[in-house]
């Protein structure tokens, strides 16, 4: 069985969790080649096994180079390993309260898929199936090439091709949210895990790149207040630690970060030319319940 066919078989098993982005009608998998809704809107599976469920083309500043750097930081440097272990424990503890399985977990804004892959690996729960959704085709192509277990979708979070009350958990890691859609697609008492940066997140990089200009300040409190308007806040966890990066890892950190987009070349060189450096990971993990 090819990788593409295996991916389509998994999609077919959970096809009832998805809907047509044009008409919101149900899908069926046709000839292990495409998705077709009741009004004959058709979407073909790509050779890597993902499917593009957007209704229009979109441009993204997040390109292949950025996603490759991000993958190396996550998978090789393990910069977020403590975060992944924390999230996986929350998921397993939460799913213990559900009498039925299988379980579907959505990573909303998954990028190249490494966060979802690591979380699922740490969960070690074969009853869980992951779905990664991102507007960036470059990210989803990379995810589908590297990680065969989850379902990968190019899709617009504002018009998500996901059915009502289909997902038990939504991950939203350092990515924009759409709480209205989150509430719609979560099962009752489903879990939202949102990760947001705190003031000291990557402070060493920010202090170098913005030494002579206004610094980027992260205020997680504003995000938490908005979050509480949509979900019952179950808990907030602060995760703060430092990790030493070598020069190659520093280059990856710069390449994966939008902070470098408007920075001076001299400031970027000042950071990446160091033999090594300590970087701070400072995050809030917001845990919300979809109470109805």
Predicted features and spans:
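Conserved alpha-helix/loop element of class I SAM-dependent methyltransferases that forms part
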Residues: 78-100
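N-terminal auxiliary segments of SAM/dcSAM-dependent transferases
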Residues: 2-60
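Helix-to-beta-strand junctions that scaffold the AdoMet/dcAdoMet cofactor pocket
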Residues: 186-187
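Conserved beta-strand signature within the Rossmann-like core of class I S-adenosyl-L-methionine
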Residues: 190-199
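A short acidic, Gly/Pro-enriched loop at the edge of an enzyme's catalytic core
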Residues: 158-169
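Conserved Class I S-adenosyl-L-methionine
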Residues: 14-16, 239-292
